[in-house]
Amino acid sequence: MDAQRDIFRHEAWFGQYVDRFLTGDAAHDAHIELKREHSLLVLGNARAIVSEAVAAGTMDVVSARAALLGALYHDIGRFRQYRRWQTFSDARSTNHGLLGGRVLNEERP
C-alpha cells in the first residue's frame, strides 16, 4: 500500500470513529465537530510541512508517515473524554493523551 493511500485509510477510519460520538444534540455535536475540524487542520498543516521536508530530503517516508499519523490522532482521546465528562479539560477529567493511547490500542485503526 502506498503512503498516501495509507494515510487516506486512516483519515476514513478517523471520520467513522468521530461519527460514533455524534448524538444529534446540536450543543454536544458542536464540541465533537470542533475537535474533528481541529484534528484535520493539524493534519493539513503536517502535510504541508512533511511535503516540504520529504522534497528537500530532510525527512524519510517512515518519519513522514509517523508525523502525519501523530497529527491526525493527537486528540483521538478527546472524543471519549467529552462523551464521559462533557469537558476537554484534562484537569477536570482524565489525561486525553493516555486515553488516546487506549483508544488506538483497542481500536487498531
Residue ranges, per PLM feature:
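Histidine/acidic-rich helix-loop-helix segments that form or flank divalent-metal centers
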Residues: D2-R9, P109
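Active-site flanking loop/helix segments enriched in acidic
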Residues: W13-G44, F79-D90
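Alpha-helical phosphate/pyrophosphate-handling elements in metalloenzyme active cores
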Residues: A30-L68, G101-P109
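Divalent metal-dependent catalytic cores for phosphoryl transfer on phosphate-bearing substrates
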Residues: V62-P109
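Membrane-targeting and insertion segments and their boundary/processing signals
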Residues: A12-Q16, A71-H74
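Alpha-helix capping and helix-coil boundary motifs
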Residues: D2, D25-A27, N95
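Short helix-loop boundary/capping segments at the starts of domains
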Residues: D19, T23, N45-A55, Y73, ...
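Alpha-helical structural motif
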Residues: D6-H10, F14, H96
